UniProtKB/Swiss-Prot annotation:
Induction: By homocysteine, 2-mercaptoethanol, tunicamycin in endothelial cells. Induced approximately 20-fold during in vitro differentiation of the colon carcinoma cell lines HT-29-D4 and Caco-2. Induced by oxidative stress in colon cancers. Decreased expression in colon adenomas and adenocarcinomas. Induced by nickel compounds in all tested cell lines. The primary signal for its induction is an elevation of free intracellular calcium ion caused by nickel ion exposure. Okadaic acid, a serine/threonine phosphatase inhibitor, induced its expression more rapidly and more efficiently than nickel. This is Protein NDRG1. The keyword Iron does not apply. It comes from Homo sapiens (Human). Residues 345-371 have a biased composition (Basic and acidic residues). The gene is NDRG1. Stress-responsive protein involved in hormone responses, cell growth, and differentiation. Acts as a tumor suppressor in many cell types. Necessary but not sufficient for p53/TP53-mediated caspase activation and apoptosis. Has a role in cell trafficking, notably of the Schwann cell, and is necessary for the maintenance and development of the peripheral nerve myelin sheath. Required for vesicular recycling of CDH1 and TF. May also function in lipid trafficking. Protects cells from spindle disruption damage. Functions in p53/TP53-dependent mitotic spindle checkpoint. It comes from the Eukaryota.
Length: 394
């Protein structure tokens, strides 16, 4: 089975978090519905932005430990290029129990849901809002939860963007190390070491400090500890790469795996990629990026997400980047990135946008960046080499 790596250079226009900025300053207000929804395994806090449109999926997000939907995703969704996408979709943000802003402490003896149970809470969320399907975006623990949800309910998931996903159970040595570090290390330090790589903690001091302060000042420490314990007690997802003539458990929907090249989750994401269907999976490694690409590289992630969504048949009229236009003007085809690869990510159907009321706009934030083609290799007609797993390094 052959594999191809496509190197695409995308320059980030500007850092999302400037010196002196705080998390609060990054959180743009939207007209939203917020509800605490009762499910099979307790209550979950949900924020719905926009109005769902007919049979169109919503974008459903799930955050990592030490975060909630605001600190994990608002910086990305407030970014101009991402708003081009969210004009087309309602967005449903799910906060793990007790992780939302102002969450009350759980009573003594409260049994926090397992990771499997957190995934089992999501059908109740969709039912509450009358939603039929989602495009999921999960980070870390949230990526695991959405993957489990997709395995259990494939008919409800049209696609997944998985940032820093780890499909494996916590190893015994990792479990022991986390227990020992819990005795000697403050909870914020444990979370920071999960979110950021060592290199990033030295080079991105301001961002790391901002998130450390969020953990200290805004998160309920008891509730956070319960969520961390649930994540560290997760089961192996037991997924396998499908082989002809065999029945295997794996994702049925398209998946975009995202990881920064200096993220502590690199090995886990590569492992996950090896277990998924190569005709439906793209691995996106971001150069000069740490553990939170949605924070430090929003332009790259928004660009990747746009073409991923287009590959599912949406956003046919999305604007072209300057590099894409320059290639067209010079007679250079997008497929030059991968000779025979077909552009299935641009054969879209029609749809409308609901998250924000924006019309056409200029692509100022990507005018200096490069076009990213993330169409997975799916064995185009005439190609007898078999399926290829695609990796994109940017």
């Amino acid at each position: 089975m052959s594999r191809e790596m496509q190197d695409v250079d995308l320059a980030e226009v500007k850092p999302l978090v400037e010196k002196g900025e705080t998390i609060t300053g990054l959180l743009q207000e939207f007209d939203v519905q917020e509800q605490d929804i009762e499910t099979l395994h307790g209550s979950v806090h949900v924020t719905l932005c926009g109005t769902p449109k007919g049979n169109r999926p919503v974008i459903l997000t799930y955050h990592d430990i030490g975060m909630n939907h605001k600190t994990c995703y608002n910086p990305l969704f407030n970014y101009e290029d991402m708003q081009e996408i969210t004009q087309h979709f309602a967005v449903c943000h799910v906060d793990a129990p007790g992780q939302q802003d102002g969450a009350a402490s759980f009573p003594a003896g409260y049994m926090y849901p397992s990771m499997d149970q957190l995934a089992e809470m999501l059908p109740g969320v969709l039912q509450q809002f009358g939603l039929k399907s989602i495009i999921g975006m999960g980070t870390g623990a949230g990526a695991y939860i959405l993957t489990r949800f997709a395995l259990n309910n494939p008919e409800m998931v049209e696609g997944l963007v998985l940032i820093n996903v780890n499909p494996c159970a916590e190893g015994w040595m990792d479990w022991a190390a986390s227990k020992i570090s819990g005795w000697t290390q403050a909870l914020p330090d444990m979370v920071v070491s999960h979110l950021f790589g060592k290199e990033e903690m030295q080079s991105n001091v301001e961002v790391v400090h901002t998130y450390r302060q969020h953990i200290v000042n805004d998160m309920n420490p008891g509730n956070l500890h319960l969520f961390i314990n649930a994540y560290n007690s997760r089961r192996d997802l037991e997924i396998e790469r499908p082989m002809p003539g065999t029945h295997t458990v794996t994702l049925q929907c398209p998946a975009l795996l995202v990881v920064g090249d200096s993220s502590p989750a690199v090995d886990a994401v590569v492992e996950c990629n090896s277990k998924l269907d190569p005709t439906k999976t793209t691995l996106l490694k971001m150069a000069d990026c740490g553990g939170l690409p949605q924070i430090s590289q929003p332009a790259k992630l928004a660009e990747a997400f746009k073409y991923f969504v287009q590959g599912m048949g949406y956003m046919p009229s999305a604007s072209m980047t300057r590099l894409m236009r320059s290639r067209t003007a010079s007679g250079s085809s997008v497929t030059s990135l991968d000779g025979t690869r077909s552009r299935s990510h641009t054969s879209e159907g029609t749809r409308s946008r609901s998250h924000t009321s924006e019309g056409t706009r200029s692509r100022s934030h990507t005018s200096e960046g490069a076009h990213l083609d993330i169409t997975p290799n799916s064995g185009a007609a005439g190609n007898s080499a078999g399926p290829k797993s695609m990796e994109v390094s940017c």
